[in-house]
Amino acid sequence: MKSDIDKIFESFDDNRIFKDKSILQSNYIPEEIPHREEQIKQVASILAPILRGERTSNLFLYGKTGTGKTLSIMYMKDELLKRVKKEGDFKLKIEYLNCKMKKVSDTEYRILAELIKKLGGEVPNTGLPTETVYTKFIELIDREKQFIVLILDEIDQTVKKISNDFLYNLTRLNSELSKTKLCIVGISNDLTFLDGLDPRVRSSLSEEEIVFPPYNALQLQEILSKRSLEAFKESVVQEGVIT
């Protein structure tokens, strides 16, 4: 048995396939994101006031699955955190939540509880009035001068399951905060998502919108080729495989 295990570990150490397998992971963020330069510039211009600790518009990113929405905003997350750490005189927290995850997708309470946990607080998964959870959320984030960005992926799925009120309540939080500034970044595959919102909710958003168009065939080929060159050792991926 030991010799078999040794062979497995030795084979892994002597991997002849990958230079860096992590490059193929869904959460990998490259140093450059090809064919999304314009969208990233737009995101940067909208969120740039954060660097001075100033309130910024809420932001909604739209596009079909696989168009680089989440990748682009996570890239911008790293850029903002890096700059604030170097130059800022306030704290910046950026938290990502996929609202389609089963453990949070069906109630406003569960989403708030998960956000509280991500921001370092504690709340039971069930058992409290939702209004109480909102109060705990406000108390948690308003303890000190800071800027918080909440990235809510698949936000349209949550609004459909819960109601417009969830989004309305989130966008109204800034009026109850004295020290902290809050920005919502929503990500949706549904380009008509905002059109279906209650006018009261839509007016409370004060949002900017960016649409991510689908990649064309040549762009996809370039992206895959670049990623494969970084991930695999030479000659592993034969010419013509990515076409």
Residue spans of the language-model regions?
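Conserved short-loop catalytic and cofactor-binding motifs
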Residues: 31, 99, 208
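A short, basic N-terminal segment
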Residues: 1-57, 79-82
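Short coil/turn segments at secondary-structure boundaries
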Residues: 34, 63-68, 102-103
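Short, charge-rich binding segments
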Residues: 50-54, 64, 82-88, 139-142, ...
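Post-Walker A helix-loop "phosphate-sensing" segment adjacent to the P-loop in P-loop NTPases
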Residues: 78-90, 122-123
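Mid-core helix/loop region of P-loop NTP-binding domains shared across ATPases and GTPases
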Residues: 2-6, 12-16, 25, 56, ...
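Glycine/charge-rich, flexible interdomain linkers and switch-proximal surface loops
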Residues: 60, 64-65, 94-96, 100
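Walker A/P-loop nucleotide-binding motif
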Residues: 54-79
